[in-house]
Amino acid sequence: MTDQEEAKLILDKLNEKIRYHDLLYYTQDSPEISDAEYDDLCHQRSIILEKFPSLNSYYQDYIGGDPDSRFSKVKHNERMLSLDNAFNKQDVEKFMVRTRKLLDMKENESLCFSCELKIDGLSFSIIYKNGKLFQASTRGNGYFGENITNNVKTIENLPHTIQNAPDFLEVRGEVYIDRNDFIQLNNEGKNFANPRNAAAGSIRQLDPTITAQRKLKYCMYTIVNSNCLTQTESLNLLNSWGFCTNEHTISTDNFEEAINFYNKMYNNRSNISYDIDGIIYKINNIKLQHILGTTSKSPRWAIAYKFPAIEGKTKLNKISIQVGRTGVLTPIAELAPINIGGVVITRASLHNKSEIERKDIREGDYVIVKRAGDVIPQVVDVDKSLRTVELAEFNFPTACPACGSTVYQAQQEVSIYCMGGLFCHNQILEKIRHFVSKDAFNIIGLGKKQLLFFYEYGLITNIIDIFTLEEKINNKNIQLSSFNGWGEKSINNLLSAINNSKVINLENFIFSLGIRFVGKHIAKILANHFISYKNWYTEMLKLAQDVNYTINIQQVGLKTINSLRTFFTEQHNLNMINNLVEHLTIIDAQSNSYVSLIHGKTIVFTGELSSMSRSEAKLKSETAGAKVSSSLSKNTDFLIIGNNPGSKYKKAQSLNIQILSEDIWLQYIQPNKV
């Protein structure tokens, strides 16, 4: 058998696999493999075709899947093509070099590209006749799509009529669903694997009233046979007709700028409300697009630079249980290492007992793991086709694995809790970790490893111990420097960080207590409402002492109020707070309707202040709206001087920076009502 004959056999098998997965993905909206695995199959096929070009005559390019027979077929006036993929910077560079060569461009000629988000949704086309929506269809196999006209009409903000449009107009775009709406949809009893499947399944409903309930969104990206000169002009025209287009779009003739846009959107994708899986580069000049034309599958003038995979398949070796600071028992998947998006994943969240039962997850299974942005990796599905032997169902523990206490499940909750409370060392350690975290007391140098060390030696067993640590070390005559990892500098830095943390704003203080349902956002709302620690504490006591008493604050719901009431009903919590505040200076919050004379200014301190510590002065200044810097520059607005100012004083004079005494600064930070 020749190499080419062998390659043809491999190609036939690859084509069969790809067609099978196309059917599942495009028509049935129930893929069995991840996008990365599918892309790998297509990549293997392209390598063979590149090595044996004559095999192209045996290979028919398919796009998507055949239309769903439940819907009437629609023949596309212009084929709806898919895009070639790039998987690294070099692939993009090759594409840009190739297009310049095909266009016979000189080295000094610029070629502008439109850089757009590749939204992970379902492609669709709409035809307008005489300004009225006439017909909408899916991509289907590129030649024929499914008629989804009535369903598309239910999408919010999609124009049914257009002013000043040509008699015949075809526009194309993407239907998608926001991640939060997808989560809500599944919480209501649906079982979609991901937002893309949810959008595709929703637009293919036989009953348009169901589609209307699904909160679908859309984004238009092209006008078929446009008279516009550029892609940028096309997008502007779509906007003028009332269509939604994507705001995250740039045009550039600079390769590095195009790559920087990719990197920026990749790093920022978790802050976008919908899923994106890459960047599309299109030649901006539409005349040049026509010159380049298309292959049987894709345009020669565009390419999709895919993001690294956020999903992958690996073996679940073991399910372990993690006990958090609120006592919640969280199941964790211990995985065979897998590289997802450049990060090696060995553990992932399984959420709760109900999720394990619903997905029928068992130790030894092969599972789909998803990682999105900074979100904790999670197991989203199980590949049961690889469960070749009978695996035992997972039994959730009836006792806390950390302390042995009984566990319980509250009514109407999926979480299971340890009843050990302060007896459970896992809860204590997690509570302390939360207390010292960045958005709470922000004590640098007290990480998980250090806390465990101090806990085991009985130096920090509760949060009060943090502020008496130096005293305990001295009383017990413990030489920290004799332990591995504890040098004189690290000890001094830690004790200094603890001392500096004793000045804290009200918002961070409330958050540090770890009260259930009181996250950073709610803590800020409470601080801004009550302004001072005294006001807040007094109201919390009223809440605890009178079951009929309540607080009316926008965005603070009954669940949060009941949690605050429960927390302040416990005497040990009151004792802890009262002991804690003896070590602290809690800075009042400033009402949102107040500003100060240093609001928005950059300030620097030098010398020793007589009225407070430097850390307290920094916090007061930041509370008043100033940015506090450690070094002078031409952007510094004020230098505040105390006793024995350093060299910054002379430098400020040479830079003509305004100098304030401590007394004047104290006046400047007072709130002025606006």
Swiss-Prot record:
<dbReference type="GO" id="GO:0046872">
    <property type="term" value="F:metal ion binding"/>
</dbReference>
<feature type="binding site">
    <location>
        <position position="139"/>
    </location>
    <ligand>
        <name>NAD(+)</name>
    </ligand>
</feature>
<feature type="binding site">
    <location>
        <position position="174"/>
    </location>
    <ligand>
        <name>NAD(+)</name>
    </ligand>
</feature>
<dbReference type="InterPro" id="IPR013839">
    <property type="entry name" value="DNAligase_adenylation"/>
</dbReference>
<feature type="binding site">
    <location>
        <position position="306"/>
    </location>
    <ligand>
        <name>NAD(+)</name>
    </ligand>
</feature>
<feature type="binding site">
    <location>
        <position position="403"/>
    </location>
    <ligand>
        <name>Zn(2+)</name>
    </ligand>
</feature>
<keyword id="KW-0479">Metal-binding</keyword>
<feature type="binding site">
    <location>
        <position position="116"/>
    </location>
    <ligand>
        <name>NAD(+)</name>
    </ligand>
</feature>
<feature type="binding site">
    <location>
        <begin position="82"/>
        <end position="83"/>
    </location>
    <ligand>
        <name>NAD(+)</name>
    </ligand>
</feature>
<comment type="similarity">
    <text>Belongs to the NAD-dependent DNA ligase family. LigA subfamily.</text>
</comment>
<keyword id="KW-0520">NAD</keyword>
<feature type="active site" description="N6-AMP-lysine intermediate">
    <location>
        <position position="118"/>
    </location>
</feature>
<keyword id="KW-0227">DNA damage</keyword>
<dbReference type="Pfam" id="PF22745">
    <property type="entry name" value="Nlig-Ia"/>
</dbReference>
<dbReference type="InterPro" id="IPR036420">
    <property type="entry name" value="BRCT_dom_sf"/>
</dbReference>
<feature type="domain" description="BRCT">
    <location>
        <begin position="593"/>
        <end position="674"/>
    </location>
</feature>
<dbReference type="Pfam" id="PF01653">
    <property type="entry name" value="DNA_ligase_aden"/>
</dbReference>
<protein>
    <recommendedName>
        <fullName>DNA ligase</fullName>
        <ecNumber>6.5.1.2</ecNumber>
    </recommendedName>
</protein>
<dbReference type="GO" id="GO:0006260">
    <property type="term" value="P:DNA replication"/>
</dbReference>
<dbReference type="InterPro" id="IPR010994">
    <property type="entry name" value="RuvA_2-like"/>
</dbReference>
<dbReference type="InterPro" id="IPR012340">
    <property type="entry name" value="NA-bd_OB-fold"/>
</dbReference>
<keyword id="KW-0862">Zinc</keyword>
<feature type="binding site">
    <location>
        <position position="282"/>
    </location>
    <ligand>
        <name>NAD(+)</name>
    </ligand>
</feature>
<dbReference type="InterPro" id="IPR004150">
    <property type="entry name" value="NAD_DNA_ligase_OB"/>
</dbReference>
<keyword id="KW-0460">Magnesium</keyword>
<dbReference type="Pfam" id="PF00533">
    <property type="entry name" value="BRCT"/>
</dbReference>
<dbReference type="GO" id="GO:0005829">
    <property type="term" value="C:cytosol"/>
</dbReference>
<dbReference type="InterPro" id="IPR041663">
    <property type="entry name" value="DisA/LigA_HHH"/>
</dbReference>
<dbReference type="Pfam" id="PF03120">
    <property type="entry name" value="DNA_ligase_OB"/>
</dbReference>
<feature type="binding site">
    <location>
        <position position="418"/>
    </location>
    <ligand>
        <name>Zn(2+)</name>
    </ligand>
</feature>
<keyword id="KW-0235">DNA replication</keyword>
<keyword id="KW-0234">DNA repair</keyword>
<dbReference type="GO" id="GO:0006281">
    <property type="term" value="P:DNA repair"/>
</dbReference>
<dbReference type="InterPro" id="IPR001357">
    <property type="entry name" value="BRCT_dom"/>
</dbReference>
<dbReference type="InterPro" id="IPR018239">
    <property type="entry name" value="DNA_ligase_AS"/>
</dbReference>
<keyword id="KW-0436">Ligase</keyword>
<comment type="function">
    <text>DNA ligase that catalyzes the formation of phosphodiester linkages between 5'-phosphoryl and 3'-hydroxyl groups in double-stranded DNA using NAD as a coenzyme and as the energy source for the reaction. It is essential for DNA replication and repair of damaged DNA.</text>
</comment>
<feature type="binding site">
    <location>
        <position position="400"/>
    </location>
    <ligand>
        <name>Zn(2+)</name>
    </ligand>
</feature>
<dbReference type="InterPro" id="IPR001679">
    <property type="entry name" value="DNA_ligase"/>
</dbReference>
<keyword id="KW-0464">Manganese</keyword>
<feature type="binding site">
    <location>
        <position position="424"/>
    </location>
    <ligand>
        <name>Zn(2+)</name>
    </ligand>
</feature>
<dbReference type="InterPro" id="IPR013840">
    <property type="entry name" value="DNAligase_N"/>
</dbReference>
